[in-house]
Amino acid sequence: MSLLNIFDIAGSALSAQSQRLNVSASNMANADSVTGPDGQPYRAKQVVFQVAAQPGQETGGVRVAQIIDDPAPDRLVFQPGNPLADAKGYVRMPNVDVTGEMVNTISASRSYQANVEVLNTTKSLMLKTLTLGQ
């Protein structure tokens, strides 16, 4: 593996973590969205990563394979005066776990920062390699 491959690998990680941050931000923004375009509460999303290695390579980058709906059930909130409440007075709310999303955001941010550091270290090594013969 050459040092140039590191740029591709770390770059793919930056892109994947950026998408993860976007999905988490969308989840938190819609944590209280009781109805969407289909009349149903917002469904939290999850990012599924996949190895993006070249055939025959043991190492490689990462890519977002898909963005799926979180299978967790909707939250039920007792609001008998709400026009969207069911016969028992419960309103179906999005299945967004705000605390979990904050943890996910911090994790994605740290991973992004770590990959930026990988790029900076690689750049520094390449510059030092160029000055070896001087």
Swiss-Prot record:
The keyword DNA repair does not apply. Disulfide bonds: none annotated. It holds the Pfam family Flg_bbr_C. Keywords: Bacterial flagellum. It is found in: Bacterial flagellum basal body. GO terms for cellular component: bacterial-type flagellum basal body, rod. Coiled coil: none annotated. One of its GO terms (biological process) is bacterial-type flagellum-dependent swarming motility. InterPro entries: Flag_bb_rod_N (IPR001444), Flagellar_basal_body_rod_CS (IPR019776), Flg_bb/hook_C_dom (IPR010930), FlgC (IPR006299). The basal body constitutes a major portion of the flagellar organelle and consists of four rings (L,P,S, and M) mounted on a central rod. The rod consists of about 26 subunits of FlgG in the distal portion, and FlgB, FlgC and FlgF are thought to build up the proximal portion of the rod with about 6 subunits each. NCBIfam families: FlgC. PANTHER family: FLAGELLAR BASAL-BODY ROD PROTEIN FLGC, FLAGELLAR PROTEIN. This is Flagellar basal-body rod protein FlgC. It comes from Yersinia enterocolitica. The gene is flgC.
